[in-house]
Structures are given as structure tokens and as C-alpha cells.
Amino acid sequence: MDTQKDVQPPKQQPMIYICGECHTENEIKSRDPIRCRECGYRIMYKKRTKRLVVFDAR
């Protein structure tokens, strides 16, 4: 009855961030420093998802 062994952890996928200075796309994993690979700028913006997002008005 060990169901914990059957459950696999989610795979670490890199998120895509856009540099605030040079506007290049950077793939950043969970342990990577938040820094542009091209210019070294530290302000990064998360890229908008392509998945459909629906908000319910209440």
C-alpha cells in the first residue's frame, strides 16, 4: 500500500524570461541565478503563457 513510490515528482522545466535591458529570451531553471546571459542585467520579466487563461466574472 505504498502509494508514495508510485507518484513521480514533477520534472524541472526551465522558465523563459525576457531581459529588461536587451530583450533577449533566457531559459532560467530553479537553481540558476536571475541574470541575463547576454548583458548581465538582473531585471527579468516572465514570458506570457500561450495557454488559454479564462477568468470568471462574479
From Swiss-Prot:
GO MF terms, alphabetically ordered: DNA binding; DNA-directed RNA polymerase activity; zinc ion binding
The entry's keywords: DNA-directed RNA polymerase, Metal-binding, Nucleus, Transcription, Zinc, Zinc-finger
Gene3D superfamilies on file: RNA polymerase ii, chain L
Cell compartments where the protein resides: Nucleus; Nucleus, Nucleolus
GO cellular component: cytosol; nucleoplasm; nucleus; RNA polymerase I complex; RNA polymerase II, core complex; RNA polymerase III complex
ZnF start-end (C4-type): 19-39
Top-level taxon of origin: Eukaryota
Residue numbers binding Zn(2+): 19, 22, 36, 39
Gene Ontology biological process terms in this record: regulation of transcription by RNA polymerase I; transcription by RNA polymerase II; transcription by RNA polymerase III
Coiled coil: none
Its job: DNA-dependent RNA polymerase catalyzes the transcription of DNA into RNA using the four ribonucleoside triphosphates as substrates. Common component of RNA polymerases I, II and III which synthesize ribosomal RNA precursors, mRNA precursors and many functional non-coding RNAs, and a small RNAs, such as 5S rRNA and tRNAs, respectively.
Family: Belongs to the archaeal Rpo12/eukaryotic RPC10 RNA polymerase subunit family.
Protein name (Swiss-Prot/TrEMBL): DNA-directed RNA polymerases I, II, and III subunit RPABC4
Native organism: Homo sapiens
